[in-house]
């Protein structure tokens, strides 16, 4: 997961009995729904801050999504989904997600968001208020242990 990212939204999602599968844990497809809930909530909150209606005129479209599972979530419980955004490109930004419950991380996720004109479905530049929100330094990430130089 990128080190150049900013926490933009957190949502608590109740785990429903119907989220479970025959294996007795939350089905892997539901993790994507939890991330979707965080993303949609954030999109609406961001639009409200701008005095706009979400998805009216322009907004994010997912072009890919992934999830890495660390442990199975089970009912009952409440999953905390943390949404982060990375360094913006011209028309896109990477979103990252962490799914937690009771102080333990259960999954990491990611989705590339391309900002589009809703009528034409063509990419458009990211809104300036989104760029200002992110304002993440576009510097090289800190060295990883493999990159670190001996002292």
Model-identified regions with their sequence ranges:
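Terminal targeting signals and extreme-terminal segments of soluble enzymes
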Residues: 1-80, 86-151
């Amino acid at each position: 997961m990128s080190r150049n990212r900013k926490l933009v939204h957190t949502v608590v999602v109740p785990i429903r009995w119907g989220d479970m599968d025959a294996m007795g844990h939350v089905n892997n497809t539901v993790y994507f729904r939890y991330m979707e809930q965080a993303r949609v909530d954030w999109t609406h909150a961001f639009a409200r801050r701008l005095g706009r209606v979400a998805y009216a005129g322009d907004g994010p479209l997912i072009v890919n999504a992934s999830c890495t599972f660390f442990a199975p979530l089970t009912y009952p419980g409440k999953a905390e989904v943390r949404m982060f955004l990375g360094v913006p490109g011209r028309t896109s930004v990477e979103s990252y997600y962490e799914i937690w419950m009771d102080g333990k991380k259960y999954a990491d996720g990611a989705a590339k968001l391309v900002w589009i004109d809703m009528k034409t479905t063509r990419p458009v530049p990211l809104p300036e208020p989104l760029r200002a929100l992110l304002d993440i330094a576009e510097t090289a990430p800190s060295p990883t242990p493999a990159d670190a130089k001996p002292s």
